[in-house]
Regions:
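C-terminal hydrophobic helical "lid"/dimerization subdomain
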Residues: 241, 249, 269-273, 318-367
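Short glycine-centered segments of the SAM/dcSAM-binding site in methyltransferase folds
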Residues: 82, 189, 279-281, 306
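Glycine-rich beta-strand-centered segment in the early N-terminal region that forms part
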Residues: 21-35, 48-98, 103, 111, ...
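Mid-domain Rossmann-like dinucleotide-binding core that forms the NAD(H)/NADP(H) cofactor-binding site
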Residues: 143-144, 150-152, 156-241, 245
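Cysteine-cluster motifs in flexible loop/terminal segments that predominantly coordinate metals
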Residues: 87-150
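Rossmann-fold dehydrogenase core element
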Residues: 280, 295-337
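ADP-ribose/adenylate-binding Rossmann-like module
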Residues: 275-290
Length: 367
């Protein structure tokens, strides 16, 4: 099969023929239909990975497709089912899984991510005797992928797979940051730093929650225009004005909730300064390894502000992925306009170049 492999950090991807073994007992082979082009893939191509892992590795962690084969002990899907792939494997037995926080699974966020293996500690990808490794347990930038059954969620067949793929990362991360992590009340104010795929999803989550005003913050006019299309009520162009002053001018006191959807420690500080007393900053973006953010210590007792992180939108994947797709089908979540460009798998490096240039809200590889 064809797959997009990364042989070393900071190098272009190569689309090549590699071998994929059949699924084991609890595993599923998926014919991938679509894979979103996400910043979390790009950082590895750019040489600034979130973690050090084995190589060569087949990237891609935001995907959807059709079940092609199943192992003998698979119980949740059948051949022909449409599925969204989840980049967090949930073991079901660790403390976090047991208390209903599968997105924080110790095993899924530990060994599966770091080692490039599936849950049993081996890889299904290889070229002859040379092993290739799995990215976040799903490797969706390929014609086919094998993953554990716990990494797939069955979805309705009437949802286009290129739209369903977005719920595998960007949309779940952004909408979930609002409805699962922040939980604003109707009428509370929201400011979103970064109007890319995740930021736009935060805006859509804020609309669902009834927040007002909803302020989009970015340095690209075209992204701010797009943010208005998805529900932002105000925009702040940081290439022209100071974000903190502009947000306080709109709200009077700062935003009740600020969301950092970029992964930049300076922006994290700006979001903190733009948060109202008693408000909350929610950090979504992944900064570089070793990066630290500095905050004034006296702000904690004097302003009662809170800063918190959220991973994968606090998702309970088997529950929240279908829930978001039901909202899409009901016309309450706009996925159609989020896909701005589609690419063939052979165009993967062009897709990453366009991501770096900020040309897309979401680019999607179509297999």
């Amino acid at each position: 099969m064809k797959a997009a492999a990364l042989h070393d950090y900071g190098q272009p991807m190569t689309v090549e023929e590699i071998e994929l073994d059949d699924p084991k007992d609890t595993e599923v082979m998926v014919k991938v239909a679509a894979s979103g082009v996400c910043h979390s893939d790009y950082v590895f191509v750019a040489g600034k990975p979130f973690f050090e892992g084995p190589r060569p590795i087949v990237l891609g962690h935001e995907g959807a497709g059709v079940v092609h084969k199943v192992g003998s002990k698979v119980t949740n899907v059948e051949v022909g089912d449409h599925v969204v792939l989840s980049w967090i494997y949930s073991c079901g037995t660790c403390t976090y899984c047991v208390v209903g926080r599968p997105n924080m699974c110790d095993f899924g966020r530990g060994e599966v991510i770091a080692n490039g293996y599936l849950a049993d500690g081996t890889t299904r990808l290889h070229k002859g005797d040379v092993p290739y490794y799995h990215f976040l347990g799903i490797s969706t930038m390929a014609e086919y992928t094998v993953c554990d059954q716990k990494s797939v969620v069955k979805v309705p067949k009437d949802v286009p797979l290129d739209k369903a793929a977005l719920v595998g990362c960007a949309v779940m991360t952004g909408v979930g940051a609002v409805i699962n992590a922040a939980k604003p009340s109707p009428g509370e104010s929201v400011a979103v730093f970064g109007a890319g795929g995740v930021g736009i999803s935060v805006i859509q989550g804020a609309v669902l929650a009834g927040a007002y005003p909803i302020i989009a913050v970015d340095n690209k006019a075209e992204k701010l225009e797009g943010a208005m299309h998805f529900g932002a009520t105000h925009t702040v162009d940081v290439s022209k004005v100071d974000a903190v002053e502009a947000i306080k001018a709109i709200t009077g006191i700062g935003a009740d909730y600020t969301f950092e959807a970029i992964g930049n420690v300076k922006v994290m500080r700006n979001a903190w300064d733009a948060t109202a007393k008693g408000g909350t900053e929610v950090v979504i973006g992944g900064a570089g390894m070793g990066d630290e953010v500095s905050l004034p210590a006296l702000d904690f007792p004097f302003t009662e502000k809170t800063i918190k992180g959220t991973g994968y939108g606090g998702a309970r994947m088997s529950v929240d992925i279908p829930r978001l797709l039901n909202l899409y089908k009901a016309g309450k979540l706009n996925l159609d306009d989020m896909v701005t460009t589609t690419y063939a798998l052979d165009e993967v490096n062009t897709a990453f170049d366009d991501l770096k240039a900020g040309k897309n809200l979401r680019g999607v590889l179509m297999m």
